[in-house]
């Protein structure tokens, strides 16, 4: 599942939760999807930060 599909499904589950509530399986799915989203976000941020070099290195 790509990040756009992941976000879309999380949003669908959130909307359903607010409107009518979630089943136990849907609640578990939402939590797993949120964890996956956060892990991907962290991974992408780490990779971006690896490529950043400070302008003035102080010793």
Curated annotation (Swiss-Prot):
This is UPF0291 protein CPE1003. It comes from Clostridium perfringens (strain 13 / Type A). The keyword Cytoplasm applies. The lineage of its organism: Bacteria, Bacillati, Bacillota, Clostridia, Eubacteriales. Signal peptide: none annotated. Disulfide bonds: none annotated. Keywords: Cytoplasm. Residues 1-30 are annotated as: Disordered. InterPro entries: DUF896. Pfam families: DUF896 (PF05979). GO terms for cellular component: cytoplasm. Belongs to the UPF0291 family. It is found in: Cytoplasm. Gene3D superfamilies: Helix hairpin bin. HAMAP family: UPF0291 (MF_01103).
